[in-house]
């Protein structure tokens, strides 16, 4: 099952009664056997795939783990990017004292790799396509912050003036491609960017 997750919705339930509404529970209302394959941050909108049975879940999870999927995101970052394309390979780890924040850590961080491409300049920033090669928590958000261009509306990593420019995080999972777990055929999906 492919869904276009809205911003400000959990992928899976959290702790507490107020954190039970999520993509997984909503999909289960129509597809009771649905299983989460991957997640998007609460503030991120865009494409997710859920498996409908254990075999499909295993196969799709393996594709994500082995990096055989294709994912691209669109974002609006704060400030004008000078370069047209680039890569960020700074290693990331959880900032345990400030969870759920992540930080760059060259000693203990895990390998993280993001490619980016400027699409156009916009007022207060640049619109970019982001391609995560790895899938670390908050990877795109921290890598863009590392470049000095945090994502507009990011309540975790952007300065106050960049947060004030949008009521939501300007990050959207626009494209998702993977091999269908039954047919093996390549599937490619896109979701319109809502900002």
Where are these regions (language model features)?
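RNA pseudouridine synthases
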Residues: 1-113, 120-123, 170, 195
């Amino acid at each position: 099952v492919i869904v276009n997750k809205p911003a400000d919705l959990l992928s899976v339930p959290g702790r507490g009664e107020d954190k039970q509404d999520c993509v997984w529970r909503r999909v289960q209302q129509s597809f009771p056997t649905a299983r989460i394959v991957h997640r998007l941050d609460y503030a991120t909108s865009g494409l997710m795939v859920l498996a409908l049975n254990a075999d499909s879940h295993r196969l799709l999870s393996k594709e994500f783990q082995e990096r055989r999927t294709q994912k691209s995101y669109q974002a609006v970052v704060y400030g004008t990017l000078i370069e047209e394309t680039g890569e960020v390979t700074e290693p990331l780890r959880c900032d345990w004292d400030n969870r759920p924040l992540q930080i760059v850590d060259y000693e203990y961080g895990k390998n993280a790799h993001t490619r980016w491409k400027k699409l156009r300049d916009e007022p207060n920033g640049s619109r970019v396509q982001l391609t995560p090669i790895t899938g670390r928590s908050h990877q795109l958000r921290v890598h863009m912050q590392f470049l000095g261009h945090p994502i507009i509306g990011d309540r975790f990593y952007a300065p106050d003036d960049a947060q004030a420019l949008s009521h939501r995080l300007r990050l959207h999972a626009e494209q998702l491609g993977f091999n269908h777990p039954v047919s093996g055929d390549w599937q490619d999906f896109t979701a319109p960017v809502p900002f």
